[in-house]
Structure formats: structure tokens, C-alpha cells
Amino acid sequence: VSADPSDVILARMMSLHPKIIDLTLDRVWRLLAALGHPERALPPVIHIAGTNGKGSTQAMMRAGLEAAGQRVHAYTSPHLVRFHERIRLAGRLIEEDALAALLDEAEAANGPDPITYFEITTCAAFLGFARTPADALLLEVGLGGRLDATNVIDRPALCVITPVSMDHEAYLGPTLGAIAGEKAGILKRGVRAVIGPQEPAAMAVIEARAEAVGAPLFVANRDWQSRRERDRLIYEDDRGLLDLPLPALPGVHQIDNAGAAIAGLRLMGLDAAACEGAVTRPEWPARMQRLTRGPLAQSAPGIELWLDGGHNPGAGVAIAATL
């Protein structure tokens, strides 16, 4: 099977920097300038950081925005099967021709200068987002937040920090507080931020950062709460109560993720119908996904098979609670 043109370009991009991860924004700013600063021409950005639940929260927010009739860009990582999964333009996965053209343009603008794979592909994605009309961009952090390639948006419409857990300590720091400090690096002056449930050590750091930069926080179990009650999702904030179906995404942890998504949608002025769409319409593969078809399921008749991409202690706790 011949490789797609984008696969060939992506393979070349892997060789532009000796490290897969090297956290700094210098190279990103250089390339964005060479590309004409596409990050300044984006639709309203919802910037999402956190250790666990970023993808699920993003998927629910996208479902809610789309239920309200909005055209939504989305940027996520990593991908499961094909790189194209990382970039949605106005609700649709990017097509091969468009992806190859964006990667070509970013590669030509960068030349031989060192840059990591995630940095150059993020810059390419910004080109696509800037050139395609949409009402919102859901922008998921790749790693950390403060020095992540996505953290070049001066004034997002909203920030979201999902639960922080121990992960990638070699890059983000050896303690929960240090990791939370990196995640809180996405907070911006005057930009509201939804904060999912946090351990006290993480919450203290997030609150200190928010106070330092002047970012208003909308915090789980203080300003909003979500809970399961009689097979319904109950969400409450100062605007009132929503009685909604349980999230379509399985897992007890999705109650918290749904709460963060709904909190964000309500801060952006969306109504109850959009919030219901957020919990009933999302799809997010490999997150507590039961395998009922395919060769693996056929090879284990009578056995329940579940697929989940969790890879840190917080995710392990969530999986155990669900099972």
C-alpha cells in the first residue's frame, strides 16, 4: 500500500529536531511569523488543558456547539490511526489533499530550522483553521500548557482545565503542584476559565496563577457541580439546574467531564438544548469503548472487551471505578 503524501511529509518532519519533546515557544513563534501569523486570524478559541478528560470534554463541547448550529474546528492529539484525526475543519476531518498542502506550506516556510513534530504540525493546523470559516475552535493542549505549541493565543474566548494528575513528570515536574503550574500556564488576563475537579495541591497552584494573571475561575464544586441522580445527569450553577440524560460516553468520570463541558457552554451563552446535545451526541473512540465487533472480539467469545487509552494513575482510578 502506497503512503499518502501527508505521511511522507510527516516522516520528514520527524527528523527536523533530535527530540520529540522540547518545550519552548521560540520555534513556534518563528514559524508562525514566517507563515503570516495565522494564530491571529482564528475564530473564537476554547483552549483546553489538563491531564485526564481533555479529549472527552472537548468532544462534548463540540457536540454541544454543533447542536446549536455552530461550525466548529477542533485540534486534538494524539491520533489513533491516521494523523488526519487531529484536525477537524468546520466539523469535518481534514481531507488528505488539504492536509498535504498545509504540511507542505509549513515545511517550506520552516526550511531546515530545528522544530519538533508537534510544533510544526500545530502551525500547519493553524493555517487551516485560519482559512476555513467557523464559529469556534476547540484547541486541545498537546503537553503541559505553559510552553505548549498551542499556547500562542493572546485572548481565547474561554479556557478549560480538566483534572490534573501525575504524568510526563520528566517534562512537567516531579510534583502535582509543578504539573498544575504548567497546565495553569494557559490562563490569560480577563479570560474566564472552567476548572474541573482537582486535588488540593493542584487547585492551590491554579488559583494562585489565576490571581496573578487576573483570570476569573469557574470552579467545580464551588461555582458549578454535576452529579448522577436516578440515571440522570444533574448539573447546577448560579443560573439554575439542568436535568439531562446521562453522558453517551461511558464511565463514571464522564459525569465530571460533562459538567466541565456544560459549564463552558453556559459561560458562552448556550442554552439547555445545546447542553443536552453535549451529553447525548459526542463520539470519542478508545475512551471506555466496548469492542463488540472485529477479529479481537471474535477471538474471545463470551468475554467483555473494553478499550481505553488511559496511561496514568488518574486514568487508572477512573477505569477501575467504571469497571
Residue positions per predicted region:
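Nucleotide phosphate-binding/pyrophosphate-handling subdomain across enzymes
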Residues: L42-P44, R131, D135-L139, L147-V160, ...
